[in-house]
């Protein structure tokens, strides 16, 4: 470890000590050296004994700076790992820091674009419009030499020298994380190294603004001409790893409820559209904005009777596959139907809990945790907390962590919070139910069968010529086996007809399995056709 890293580690440790965070260190042999180290730093006292632990942890992270603030924000979404009071305190962390010098921002932009700012822009404001731990934004407008002359823009700039700071602090986090699981079984459950690895990926992705650009373009295309959501345009010719240029938007912050009401906004429709936007992203697009907190969501002040959201900052997004979406849709529908066995089976069928899981015990665990939720009216039930309860139960049955679902659950909590802030009477279930049912119908209904056949048509054409021969071979094999069965029957007659029937049934079952295995590479309906043919032959032979 370098001298610089050692100094930083000392700073981190003493900061935690001044806020009494060391009280969580258990008195066990493994922590003996840590406790001795605490005594060695006897002059560093807990200066905030009158504050609850959650408040002290939040203040400590705030003092340690941007990297630790963002870690706390991420941990606040992991309500499957922490007590609600602690998670709520971490959620109060604000990613707002002093801006760096505007002249430095100008220099970074000019270096990225390869020329003076005045070549492309007028009215560049060196005073940052907003500043966060990773980047800050400045305003300008395209000059008369540009096709979009006079268009207002925002330039986002990565902080200088932030990457080495992040990497140094992440390295220290890994050291601390490797020690945590040895403290206790509860500490193992935190999976601290996985949390740090997930956080590292998120941070490093945010350092590459071309990712944000690509995400914004994809989201904008998904909602092109939509009345529900508008995503500002990215000007790709001006976008680089550390600088992006985008359309400037003018909207009302979604958290400014009084201004929205004064503008005549239809608050009920606005709240419902927030839920609709989220579920459209999840079930239609399999791609969702995963950082939809109040600072990134605005409302178009025009046509307030038909309110439209404006979404910015697409640095963090989530993606889902068919298995993820099926899990979500079926789990929610089964939950609201109070079909806890189906919820349990969904976790096993998804492959996220071991195949030998005791389904009866799993079902009962879901029932005990979820049934009390129905003491509330359906309109007051939180989807985010339902998902959290499902995760908590599943973890007790060794469910593997699904980062994409954790990200989705965090986003769902944001959406619910904003929706009920805008319109407290929002009925999430009634708003989301059509999306869930329509998606399930499309996956298992007639449309799904026709779509599957259409997708498999090339395979069918390729294997069609093999079908008659395959059926003929299967029937020939059946004849040979029947001959041997008859021989076997003669020797078993003394033991009664029932045993003979059982043998025939067992062997027939083996044949059927063999046919299924033999044609597993054929289209679904072609394999089924072969199986039905063999079954008919068996039935006719049995009657004869």
From Swiss-Prot:
Pathway: Cofactor biosynthesis; ubiquinone biosynthesis [regulation]. Keywords: ATP-binding, Cell inner membrane, Cell membrane, Kinase, Membrane, Nucleotide-binding, Transferase, Transmembrane, Transmembrane helix, Ubiquinone biosynthesis. GO terms for cellular component: plasma membrane. It is an enzyme of class 2 (transferase). The keyword Transport does not apply. SUPFAM superfamilies: Protein kinase-like (PK-like). InterPro entries: ABC1_dom, Kinase-like_dom_sf, UbiB, UbiB_bact, UbiB_kinase. Its EC number is 2.7.-.-. It comes from the Bacteria. The chain crosses the membrane at residues 522-540. It is a single-pass membrane protein. Signal peptide: none annotated. It is found in: Cell inner membrane. ATP binds at residues 129-137, 156. The active site is at 291 (proton acceptor). Its main location: membrane. GO terms for molecular function: ATP binding; protein kinase activity. Belongs to the ABC1 family. UbiB subfamily. Is probably a protein kinase regulator of UbiI activity which is involved in aerobic coenzyme Q (ubiquinone) biosynthesis. This is Probable protein kinase UbiB. It comes from Actinobacillus pleuropneumoniae serotype 5b (strain L20). The lineage of its organism: Bacteria, Pseudomonadati, Pseudomonadota, Gammaproteobacteria, Pasteurellales.
